[in-house]
């Protein structure tokens, strides 16, 4: 998902030219809403040190995950029922903010552990599905919800000629219908 710098983690939490590029793009295309995986390296050690250790495990987002107009998705473990924010268990790998300008990111979380997904069959296995984990498994669930909302919006508003909700409306709907997650 990081289209700017393969293994280069950049400056944590900083609003970069890459972040700005996404915001300019979305500003010029008001129906376009990028959904970006937050990253999976929160507890990864490099040279015997956690990423951005000076921030005590926070402020780990880089590049496109710091953009203002994209929806950034964290990965959580699944849960059977929601009773309160403590019902939601954050994965031990999902990266999170805040950003250097104190915005709260990721914007939302979805199940990212034990997600059954398509798999490339190999010579040793013909199984076309496997269980995976990661923020790249959580982000498609959020994208699917947005697609369902768009479909419902079209069904409700087709008689007046409205085709799609704007990206800002989707983000607002997400923010106002999600339940608090975690005790962080």
Predicted regions and their residues:
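Substrate-binding/access-modulating region of protease and related hydrolase catalytic domains
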Residues: 1-67, 80, 100-103, 117, ...
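A general alpha-helical scaffold signature found inside nucleotide-binding enzyme cores
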Residues: 13-20, 88, 165-169
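Flexible, small-residue-rich helix->loop connector segments that border functional cores
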Residues: 27-31, 94-101, 149-163
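Acidic glycine-/aspartate-rich tracts in secreted/extracellular proteins
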Residues: 41-42, 77-80, 113, 179-182
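Internal glycine-rich alpha/beta core junctions
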Residues: 64, 68, 86-117
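Alpha-helical segment proximal to the catalytic Tyr-Lys
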Residues: 73
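Hydrolase catalytic cores
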Residues: 110-184
């Amino acid at each position: 998902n990081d289209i700017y710098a393969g293994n280069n983690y950049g400056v944590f939490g900083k609003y970069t030219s890459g972040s700005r590029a996404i915001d300019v793009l979305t500003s010029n295309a008001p129906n376009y809403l990028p959904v970006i995986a937050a990253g999976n390296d929160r507890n990864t050690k490099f040279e015997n040190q956690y990423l951005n250790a000076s921030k005590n495990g926070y402020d780990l987002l880089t590049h496109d995950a710091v953009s203002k107009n994209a929806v950034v998705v964290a990965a959580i473990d699944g849960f059977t029922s929601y009773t309160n924010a403590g019902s939601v268990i954050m994965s031990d790998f999902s990266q999170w903010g805040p950003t250097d300008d104190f915005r709260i990111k990721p914007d939302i979380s979805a199940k990212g552990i034990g997600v059954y997904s398509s798999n490339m069959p190999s010579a040793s296995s013909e199984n076309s599905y496997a269980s995976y984990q990661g923020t790249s498994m959580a982000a498609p669930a959020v994208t699917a919800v947005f697609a369902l909302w768009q479909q419902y919006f079209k069904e409700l508003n087709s008689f007046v000629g409205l085709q799609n909700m704007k990206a800002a409306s989707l983000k607002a709907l997400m923010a106002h219908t999600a339940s608090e997650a975690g005790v962080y």
